Amino acid sequence: MRALRAASIAVLAPLLCAQTVNLNDLLASMRKRIETADFRATGHLVWVQPSGVRLSYPITVKARWFPGVLREFVEMGAAARTPGNAPPGARLATHALLEMRPNGQSSISIAHPGDKSPTVLPVEKWSEGPLGPGFGYEDLLEQQYFWTGQASEGKARFGARDCIIVKSTPGPTDRSHYAQVKTWLDPSIGFPVYVEKTVKESGVVKEFTYYGIRHEEGVWSAHQVEVKVRGQSGSTLLILDRGSARANLTLADFSPAQLTKF
């Protein structure tokens, strides 16, 4: 019996170590993807109403990592027509400047046509977005990979992909309106295929599904991300049609002064 126990430990120990290393390697891969970002992409943010009617808004996203901070500049135009039940932000063009710092001190500023100066959003409004709470501003940051709380919840299959589920929880200094984020990561490419984000206090769960995952210019990306609020009808789609994974952006591309220029 003692020999059997020793043999079991000898077999299990490497497996447990491999799981730990695998999680660390996955997180390192995700962080590296963000810390080497330098892209520009254009496409549409699409609001799919419960009735199935779609409203499309042009969007441009550019992002680059600078020492200690990821900067993103988002430009969203107004739709050709806007129904009466549309969120207030959907009626106006929107500019947003997002800054993500690994120490948790991220920030989000937005502006609309006619604004003399941008508005710095408090954390409690990070769940909001141009089209309502489905796809919020914070969802563009992917800061969960830098949070202090990281744990593996084992393996799972999502569609045709074998994934490892990573549970990320913010620490006391991490600014976020999420209580936790669970990510289904494909370890063979180091890229998410599905994500569940739980909102603080309300417990609302938002589901993000990645479609059209591709490898271009040495970078993995998704052609489309669909966001659904669990238990609610309708969805929001972020569709990226074209762009460059090596855009050679500079600090001038992220000047706060650009927020009020429409």
Sequence positions of predicted segments:
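One face of beta-strands
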Residues: 39-43, 59, 72-74, 106-108, ...
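Hydrophobic h-region of N-terminal signal peptides that target proteins for export
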Residues: 10-19
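Bacterial N-terminal signal peptides that target proteins for export
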Residues: 1-8
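Extended lipid/amphipathic-ligand handling interfaces
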Residues: 30, 59-64, 209-215
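N-terminal, post-signal-peptide region of Sec/Tat-exported proteins
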Residues: 42-77
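Edge/loop elements at the starts and ends of beta-strands within beta-rich repeat scaffolds
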Residues: 31-39, 67, 215-219
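Flexible, processing/modification-adjacent segments and terminal tails
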Residues: 19-28, 32-38, 44, 53, ...
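Gly/Pro-enriched, hydrophobic low-complexity segments
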Residues: 79, 85, 128-143, 152, ...
